[in-house]
């Protein structure tokens, strides 16, 4: 199978896993928003933020280092496996020992500390399966990875729904995380058994190069997590835990929902781009095309969600969550800008230049924290969210000048064109959607949402169909040929 065929197959499997995981996630989010109070949902959101942050330590960039390595010796894999497990134990101990202090950071009570303690056990369990997933990714065995993701997500979904329905308490989420982490580790280890040619031996000299590569990734990831999670932490201190709960729901049905497509691109692009990493000309061409293609998917979905947000929240959520409508809309705009980052990060990974993103991350923190604090004091929750939007605009502009141009020499006019083309093609959809929203207001929220969504989809399809741009014609032919191939196979 050629590299192109492997990449296309990988995208399909990742997309399937992402879609099903998103469906399970949305259903559980909807159920929990009805079953729990705003305060309880805030506790859950804070616990998940902490869990995500600590999980960054578990991998330490080792997985990406394994994926990009042309050859791997047995002692390398053995030593890296030992490091993963050691980091899992360290992360667990940190969470257990400092659970009370972490909870106080969010102005929370003992319930959050209990959540953290339960989740900490999952860090050790997860560490045993990290290398197995890295090896499967390196071999581009995305079919197995997708099946594992779907199975563990379904197990998490069933656990969350059943426990929350019975006990109506935040700790149910922590226990469900523990159950799904166990399932994911077991399934990953089993699927990767033919690739596991290592034991529990350790030699520091065998992992030096992986540390040099991984340290850039883990510091960058930690800075990124601090940057993202600064906003909910400030919400808890300036407003309340309920504000975090509302922000989490808004994020999940806007940026979070569509950001799940980013791993579909990054997890499949990285191994594929690694094969052409030595040819900057090919990398530039691939980056520009991928930027346009991903924007053609992300822009209409996020901006479409921004338009239907008032109806969506009114139809699916209780009155206690109506305050999240403007938050969803601002986050959708921020998400559209943020989606441009995925191809850039893939290129930096291939070129082993993640230190560039690290410096940019520090700059975003220096600007973002005081800006967000100021806007939060002035305008409350919506001010904090606007702070997030401003930082995303800054990141997109600086991303070209400090990341792309120095790493592979992309011309500014070419990169701007790759963004402007999808932006211009989505503009008629946005205009038509806003007009339809006000025109169909008398129909009621449910019919209004359906009518607006239909208008947006139809307008976008027509715009794409009649587009004179060559890259759009290529995009259209790619989508059409895949659909025809699927139909003729049936």
Regions found by a protein language model. Give the residues of each.
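Interhelical loop/hinge segments that connect adjacent transmembrane helices in multipass membrane
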Residues: 1-3, 7, 143, 186-229, ...
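Signature of the first transmembrane helix
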Residues: 3-60, 87-99, 118, 122, ...
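Membrane-interface junctions at transmembrane-helix termini in multi-pass inner-membrane proteins
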Residues: 4, 8, 65-74, 125-149, ...
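Transmembrane helical elements of multi-pass membrane transporters/channels
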Residues: 10-25, 176-180, 184, 188, ...
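Alpha-helical transmembrane segments of multi-pass membrane transport and lipid-handling proteins
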Residues: 19-23, 82-107, 114, 118, ...
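Helix-loop junctions and terminal segments of transmembrane helices
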Residues: 55-74, 137-138, 250, 254-298, ...
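Hydrophobic alpha-helical transmembrane segments
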Residues: 113, 117-120, 147-194, 209, ...
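Membrane-proximal transmembrane or re-entrant/amphipathic helices at the cytosolic face
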Residues: 410, 415, 433-490
């Amino acid at each position: 199978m050629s590299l192109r065929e492997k990449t296309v197959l990988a995208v399909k499997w990742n997309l399937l896993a992402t879609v099903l995981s998103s469906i399970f996630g949305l259903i559980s989010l909807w159920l929990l928003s009805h079953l729990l109070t705003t305060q309880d949902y805030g506790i859950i959101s804070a616990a998940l933020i902490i869990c995500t942050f600590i999980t960054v330590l578990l991998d330490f960039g080792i997985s990406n280092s394994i994926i990009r390595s042309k050859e791997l010796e047995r002692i390398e894999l053995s030593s890296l496996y030992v490091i993963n497990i050691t980091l899992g134990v360290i992360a667990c101990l940190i969470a257990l020992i400092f659970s009370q202090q972490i909870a106080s950071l969010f102005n929370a009570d003992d319930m959050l500390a209990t959540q953290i303690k339960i989740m900490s056990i999952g860090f050790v369990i997860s560490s045993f399966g990290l290398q197995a997933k890295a090896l499967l990714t390196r071999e581009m065995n995305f079919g197995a990875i997708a099946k594992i993701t779907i199975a563990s997500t379904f197990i998490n979904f069933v656990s969350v729904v059943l426990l929350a329905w019975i006990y109506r308490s935040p700790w149910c989420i922590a226990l469900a995380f523990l159950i799904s982490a166990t399932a994911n580790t077991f399934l990953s280890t089993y699927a990767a058994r033919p690739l596991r040619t290592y034991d529990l031996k350790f030699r520091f000299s065998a992992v030096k190069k992986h540390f040099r590569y991984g340290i850039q990734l883990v510091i960058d990831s930690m800075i990124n997590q601090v940057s993202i999670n600064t906003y909910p932490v400030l919400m808890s201190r300036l407003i309340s835990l309920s504000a975090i709960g509302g922000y989490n729901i808004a994020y999940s049905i806007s940026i979070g929902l569509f950001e799940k497509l980013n791993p579909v691109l990054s997890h499949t692009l990285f191994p594929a781009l690694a094969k052409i990493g030595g040819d900057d000309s090919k990398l530039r061409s691939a980056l520009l095309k991928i930027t346009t293609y991903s924007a053609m998917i992300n822009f209409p979905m996020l901006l479409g969600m921004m338009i239907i947000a008032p109806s969506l929240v009114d139809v699916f959520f209780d009155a206690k969550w109506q305050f999240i409508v403007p938050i969803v809309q601002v986050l959708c705009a921020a998400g559209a800008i943020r989606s441009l980052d995925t191809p850039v990060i893939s290129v930096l990974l291939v070129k082993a230049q993640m230190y560039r993103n690290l410096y940019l991350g520090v700059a975003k923190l220096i600007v973002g924290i005081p800006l967000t604090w100021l806007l939060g004091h002035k305008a409350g929750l919506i001010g904090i969210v606007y702070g997030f939007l401003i930082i995303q605009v800054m990141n997109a502009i600086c991303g070209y000048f400090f990341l792309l141009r120095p790493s592979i020499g992309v011309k500014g006019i070419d990169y701007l064109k790759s963004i402007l083309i999808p932006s211009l093609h989505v503009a008629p959809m946005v205009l038509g959607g806003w007009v339809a929203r006000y025109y169909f207001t008398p129909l009621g929220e449910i019919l209004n949402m359906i009518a607006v969504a239909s208008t947006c989809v139809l307008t976008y399809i027509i715009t794409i169909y009649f587009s004179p741009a060559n890259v759009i014609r290529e995009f259209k032919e790619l989508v059409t040929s895949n659909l025809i191939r699927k139909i003729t196979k049936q």
